[in-house]
Regions:
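Short beta-strands and strand-loop turn motifs
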Residues: 19-21, 51-53, 82-86, 111-116, ...
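Classical nucleotidyltransferase
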Residues: 90-199, 278-282
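Active-site-proximal cofactor/substrate-binding loop regions of enzyme domains
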Residues: 39, 46-108
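Short acidic-hydrophobic, aromatic-tinged amphipathic segments that line or gate anion-handling sites
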Residues: 2-8, 83
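Phosphate/ribose-recognition catalytic cores of enzymes acting on nucleotide-derived substrates
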Residues: 189-309
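Residue-level signal for inorganic ion chemistry
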Residues: 27, 74, 112, 172, ...
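Short glycine/serine/threonine/alanine-rich loop segments
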Residues: 42-47, 79, 140, 178, ...
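N-terminal catalytic cores of NTP/NDP-binding nucleotidyl/phosphoryl-transfer enzymes
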Residues: 7-67
Length: 309
């Protein structure tokens, strides 16, 4: 999948179908929208693009996923390219300028697909109905997706963000369409886990990302062609008086050196709060309890359940 940054880069080589939105979380309503756009693109034999935004679009709200994490999902959903528009550079355009200058002239969009609550243009003055009218005036078409609910409530990024901050991972998974994950390159830690007999992989937490509930999670870690079960701690390791929040994952039944490699940690379920133990021996005993519980609760995890392949 190709990545473009607007207005620094524009894609002008032919016509396309564009899925429009901020897509924070790429939840089940977003996935439904992108799948609609994909089917249209396939039928019209046109490339499928995602048009989204960078910058403070949501008034300082914590992001569910970083752009890099979203790219991985976009590609798995069939996108040929993604355009990241600098929100600060385009926020003062009129709705007419947004459609005619960016979507149609610069990007070659002939069919756009957006959600019922999509807003665009100066002061968010453009809405779904004006998108349909402006695309038609430009010789194109806009398809508007209806609201999607789950459990009687609208599926929204705000709702998912609240679930993640409270550790309700299974509920978040049902709205996201796949387990929430973090991605990064494995860093060297202080080797504490190794000295306890539980070597861990350490990933930095994304700046500006959603604040996850601190504690221990049951997790899944794809490495190569295999999915491993894991136990992930999100927090500061209070037993050893560390300060920065990071993630440490003990990967069950894995032996290998993956320092410097990029991996994904899927958080399946919240197990317990982070605890400051009196001694390392007490911590080791608890990790064994966590490990045995994880083994008992883990079933076979498929690539499809992780939203992959």
């Amino acid at each position: 999948m190709q990545i473009y940054e607007y207005p620094r880069e524009t894609r002008i080589d032919g016509k396309c179908v564009l899925a429009l939105g901020f897509f924070d979380g790429v939840h089940i309503a977003h996935r439904d929208l992108i799948e609609t756009a994909r089917k249209i693109a396939e039928k019209k034999r046109l490339p499928l693009g995602i048009f989204t935004f960078t910058g403070d679009v949501k008034g300082g709200a914590e992001r569910i996923y970083s752009d890099r994490e979203k790219n991985r999902i976009f590609e798995s959903l069939g996108a040929d390219f993604t355009v990241y528009a600098d929100f600060a550079a385009i926020k003062d355009l009129t709705p007419e300028e947004f459609v005619e200058k960016i979507l149609v002239s610069s990007l070659g969009c002939v069919i756009s697909v957006a959600g019922f609550n999509f807003r665009f243009g100066r002061g968010a003055s453009g809405d779904a109905e004006s998108l349909k009218a402006l695309m038609a005036r430009a010789g194109g078409e806009a398809v508007i997706k209806s609201e999607i609910t789950h459990g009687g409530e609208t599926v929204s990024s705000t709702r998912i963000r609240n679930l993640l901050t409270s550790g309700r991972m299974k509920e978040a998974t049902s709205l996201l369409g796949a387990p929430y994950y973090i991605i990064g390159r494995v860093e060297h830690g202080n080797k504490t886990g190794r000295t306890l007999g539980f070597p861990t992989v350490n990933l930095p937490m994304s700046e500006g990302g959603v604040t996850l509930r601190r504690g221990v999670y049951r997790s899944a870690v794809p490495i190569g062609e295999k999915i491993y079960h894991g136990i992930t701690n999100i927090g500061t390791c209070p037993t050893f008086d560390e300060r920065s929040v990071h993630s440490e994952t003990y990967i069950l039944d894995f032996e290998g050196d993956i320092y410097g490699e990029e991996i994904c940690i899927y958080l399946l379920d919240f197990m317990r709060e982070e605890i400051a133990f009196s001694t390392p021996s007490d911590l080791k005993m608890q990790i064994n309890i966590d490990k045995n519980r994880a083994i008992k609760e883990n079933g076979d995890i498929t690539w499809q359940e992780l939203g992959l392949k």
